[in-house]
Amino acid sequence: MPKGSGKVIAQNKKAFHDYFIDETYEAGLVLQGTEIKAIRAGRVNLKDAFARVHNGEVWVHNMHISPYEQGNRFNHDPLRTRKLLLHKKEIQKLVGYTKETGYTLVPLKIYLKNGFAKMALGLARGKKQYDKRHDLKEKEAKREIARAFRDRQKM
């Protein structure tokens, strides 16, 4: 998680289930007028979103921002591709990693920081099915241990 993150608006829980997150980056979002109002209202879905580097710029695809209800004719397209703002060195580093096989850029969450919408972008490797099963077993074991301690303290 980036330092000093503010109010979390939306999280991509599926990304943590489907990928190993190696690094995270904080990126600004280039938005149109009513998009920031819809984000502040929490009308964002990151479930199928992904990011790509194209011509030295990072773009996020399939991020759904619902139209703002009071936006009438000035509303935006909910699934348009949006530009992400990163430092040039970060973009060059991401280009190097994404050209390697198995790495992809996944949006992890959207949050507000000092009034601006920011996105936590993760550099991720895909998990295999057995990795997912192993993570589920570990999670269940931790839950059982916590339950046992809780029951023990009640006595």
UniProtKB/Swiss-Prot annotation:
Protein origin, superkingdom:
Bacteria
The record's section on InterPro entries has:
SmpB (IPR023620), SsrA-bd_prot (IPR000037), SsrA-bd_prot_CS (IPR020081)
Q: What is this protein called?
A: SsrA-binding protein
What HAMAP family does the record point to?
SmpB
Key words of the record: Cytoplasm, RNA-binding
What function does the entry list?
A: Required for rescue of stalled ribosomes mediated by trans-translation. Binds to transfer-messenger RNA (tmRNA), required for stable association of tmRNA with ribosomes. tmRNA and SmpB together mimic tRNA shape, replacing the anticodon stem-loop with SmpB. tmRNA is encoded by the ssrA gene; the 2 termini fold to resemble tRNA(Ala) and it encodes a 'tag peptide', a short internal open reading frame. During trans-translation Ala-aminoacylated tmRNA acts like a tRNA, entering the A-site of stalled ribosomes, displacing the stalled mRNA.
Gene Ontology CC = cytosol
Q: Which NCBIfam families match?
A: PRK05422.1, smpB
Which molecular-function annotation in GO is an example for this chain?
A: RNA binding
Where found? Cytoplasm
Q: Name one Pfam family in it.
A: SmpB
Which SUPFAM superfamilies does the record associate with it? Small protein B (SmpB)
Q: Which PROSITE patterns match?
A: SSRP
Q: What is its main location?
A: cytoplasm
Protein family according to the UniProt entry: Belongs to the SmpB family.
- What's any GO biological process attached to this entry? trans-translation
**Iron keyword on record:** no
> CDD domains per the record?
SmpB
